[in-house]
Design a protein with these regions (language model features):
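Bacterial N-terminal signal peptides that target proteins for export
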Residues: 1-9
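Bacterial N-terminal signal peptides
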Residues: 8-17
Length: 129
């Protein structure tokens, strides 16, 4: 019976149009003048020295392409202090709302994490123990 109730609640939430923001547990991890960065702490995966985590950027103003928010998978190499983004979906509205502006499925190139950027905050959260 409990399984049926849980399944019903799950489906009711999906049918009710839960946005990606409410469907996932986003935690604010940092902010600059341009962007607020959120992570889904429940999504962290560990594979040796690699950490994978879903992140969301909420821009204060739309960028040149009209993007106001984006969600993506960020992989962190804890040994070499590098990261790469992929599976990115960008939206015209704040917090993953509005029209879908762009979508990229592939993972990007590995890049060094800038010491004063927002990605260093997630690196510390997922790699430093």
């Amino acid at each position: 019976m409990r399984a049926v109730v849980r399944w019903s609640l799950c489906c009711a939430g999906l049918a009710g149009g839960l946005s990606p923001l409410t469907a996932q547990a986003w935690t604010r991890i940092g902010e600059t003048q341009e962007v607020t960065l959120f992570v889904n702490r429940k999504s962290i995966e560990r594979d040796d020295n690699i950490r994978r985590v879903w992140e969301m950027q909420d821009l204060k103003t739309p960028d040149a392409e009209g993007v106001r928010s984006r969600r993506y998978l960020n992989e962190y190499d804890c040994t070499y202090k590098m990261h790469r983004l992929g599976q990115m979906t960008s939206y015209a509205g704040p917090k993953l709302t509005g029209k879908k502006v762009a979508e990229v499925k592939e993972m990007g190139y590995w890049r060094k994490i800038p010491p004063n950027g927002v990605f260093v905050l997630t690196y510390i959260a997922v790699c430093v123990e």
